[in-house]
């Protein structure tokens, strides 16, 4: 018995729908990781504990003055973001590492790499304190990048454009403190990646990565500020507020007030302070005024934005 026209169209429609639902398109790896289960939180916690227990590297610190304006072309005259780590308060618990891993979707590593201490963590431990990229104002890593993937923002962050990275590893070789991490493994295919935070992309095999000072948080706050500014200008100059809810001093200038990093948020002892070195109202400036500041000797001449502090002047 033949199939009539209505039944034929119905069958074709069903086949088309089934194709769309069950495999007519291949999901990108990033989406697979987002939709899949991925490693458990406990696995990430266990890896951080292992990393902290293995940490043996020591810091050779030298005194420096407080970071000032950047000397790079196009630098912002009002913003230079950075951090200070209080060695008198830090107890080396490692909570900052776990918070960073979740915020930035830092993957796990295979067991043999973990046993050798080869982690992908953006925050490591040295001398019992958190250690990460110092976002140097004269960053040697940026100068040798052949594609411009390693670059400096006007606000003082040493940033990475992942899609532009060719994996030359020149930047990693030129970092005096080995703060950069290279993706030797395809963490997504190996089931080692989990997307905790939708705002940060998972990185591919062959890409370099490192601490970003939670650049996405700053970008979100800047966008919010500009949106509020546009609305305020449209209704006659209403006050513009930043992330902390406080009106900005100059209604047209974004200063990033109220923005924090994941590691700073996670520190129960308040040993990690994030802020703007060029803003006198920033907690970073207020809390470092009478402190002695230090940086690793290897980068003392590179104008780092992340410093350590201990004792008082």
Placement of each model-derived feature along the sequence:
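Classical protein tyrosine phosphatase
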Residues: 95-101, 170
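N-terminal secretory signal peptides and thylakoid transit peptides that target proteins
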Residues: 1-19
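Ferredoxin-like iron-sulfur electron-transfer modules
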Residues: 68-92, 119-173, 179-261
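Long, compositionally biased charged/polar accessory segments in the mid-to-C-terminal portions
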Residues: 216-313
């Amino acid at each position: 018995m033949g199939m009539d026209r209505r039944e034929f169209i119905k069958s074709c429609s069903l086949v088309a729908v089934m194709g769309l639902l069950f495999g007519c398109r291949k999901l990108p790896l990033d989406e697979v990781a987002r939709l899949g289960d991925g490693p458990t939180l406990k696995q990430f916690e266990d890896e951080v504990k292992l990393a902290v227990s293995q940490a043996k590297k020591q810091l050779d610190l030298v005194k420096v003055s407080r970071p000032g304006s950047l000397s790079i072309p196009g630098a912002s005259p009002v913003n230079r973001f950075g951090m200070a780590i209080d060695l008198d308060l830090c107890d080396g618990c490692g909570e900052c590492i776990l918070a960073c891993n979740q915020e930035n979707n830092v993957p796990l590593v295979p067991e043999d790499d973990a046993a050798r201490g080869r982690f992908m963590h953006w925050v490591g431990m040295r001398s019992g304190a958190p250690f990460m990229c110092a976002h140097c104002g004269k960053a040697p890593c940026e100068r040798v990048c052949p594609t411009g993937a390693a670059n400096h923002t006007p606000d003082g962050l040493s940033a990475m454009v992942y899609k532009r990275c060719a994996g030359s590893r020149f930047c990693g070789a030129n970092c005096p403190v080995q703060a950069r991490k290279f993706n030797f493994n395809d963490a997504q295919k190996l089931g080692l990646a989990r997307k905790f935070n939708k705002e940060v992309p998972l990185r591919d095999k062959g890409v370099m990565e490192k601490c970003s000072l939670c650049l996405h948080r700053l970008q979100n706050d800047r966008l919010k500020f500009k949106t509020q500014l546009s609305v305020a200008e449209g209704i006659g100059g209403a006050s513009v507020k930043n992330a902390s809810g406080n009106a900005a001093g100059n209604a047209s200038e974004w200063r990033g007030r109220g923005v924090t990093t994941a590691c700073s948020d996670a520190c129960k002892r308040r040993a990690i302070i994030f802020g703007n070195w060029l803003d006198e109202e920033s907690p970073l400036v207020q809390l470092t005024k009478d402190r002695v500041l230090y940086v690793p000797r290897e980068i003392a001449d590179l104008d780092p934005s992340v410093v350590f502090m201990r004792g008082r002047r």
